C-alpha cells in the first residue's frame, strides 16, 4: 500500500467531483428543467454548450469514482472518507469567488468550511498503522 498514491487518487476524486458540481450548477442555470430537454431540443432552443458541460460533468463523476476506488486500495476508509469533505469546501470557495456563479460568501458558511477543513486535517494528521489485523490476508 502506498499512502501517497492513495492520497493522490483521493484528491483527484475530490477535484473531479468538485469540477462536476460546478459544471452542473453552471449548466442548470442555462438549461430548462431536465423533463423539458427533449421538447427544447426538438424546438432547437437548448444551449448545446451547457448540455455538453452536463455530459462532461457526468464523465467527471465516473472518473471520480474510478479515482475513489483506487484510493481505497491504499488508504483506510476512515481516513479516505474524510478527504471527500474537501469537496464541500472547494465547491463553496470556488462558487463564491467566481463571478459566473453569483454565490455570496457568508460568515456562517465560511466558518463551517473552516471547521470541515480542520476536521480533515485532524483526522489525517495522525499516522495510521501500516497494517491492521483486518487488513492482512
UniProtKB/Swiss-Prot annotation:
It is a multi-pass membrane protein. Keywords: Cell inner membrane, Cell membrane, Lipid A biosynthesis, Lipid biosynthesis, Lipid metabolism, Lipopolysaccharide biosynthesis, Membrane, Transmembrane, Transmembrane helix, Transport. GO terms for biological process: lipid A biosynthetic process; lipopolysaccharide biosynthetic process. Residues 1-5, 71-80, 124-137 are cytoplasmic. Residues 27-49, 102 are periplasmic. One of its GO terms (molecular function) is carbohydrate derivative transmembrane transporter activity. The chain crosses the membrane at residues 6-26, 50-70, 81-101, 103-123. The keyword Membrane applies. GO terms for cellular component: plasma membrane. HAMAP family: Flippase_ArnF. Belongs to the ArnF family. This is Probable 4-amino-4-deoxy-L-arabinose-phosphoundecaprenol flippase subunit ArnF.
Amino acid at each position: 500500500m502506498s499512502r501517497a498514491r492513495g492520497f493522490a487518487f483521493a484528491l483527484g476524486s475530490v477535484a473531479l467531483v468538485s469540477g462536476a458540481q460546478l459544471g452542473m450548477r453552471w449548466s442548470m442555470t442555462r438549461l430548462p428543467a431536465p423533463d423539458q430537454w427533449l421538447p427544447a431540443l426538438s424546438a432547437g432552443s437548448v444551449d448545446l454548450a451547457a448540455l455538453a458541460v452536463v455530459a462532461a460533468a457526468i464523465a467527471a463523476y465516473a472518473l471520480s469514482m474510478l479515482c475513489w476506488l483506487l484510493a481505497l486500495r491504499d488508504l483506510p476508509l476512515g481516513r479516505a472518507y474524510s478527504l471527500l469533505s474537501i469537496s464541500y469546501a472547494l465547491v463553496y470557495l470556488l462558487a463564491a469567488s467566481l463571478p459566473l456563479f453569483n454565490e455570496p460568501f457568508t460568515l456562517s458558511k465560511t466558518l463551517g468550511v473552516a471547521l470541515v477543513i480542520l476536521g480533515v486535517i485532524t483526522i489525517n494528521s495522525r499516522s495510521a498503522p501500516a497494517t491492521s489485523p483486518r487488513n492482512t490476508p
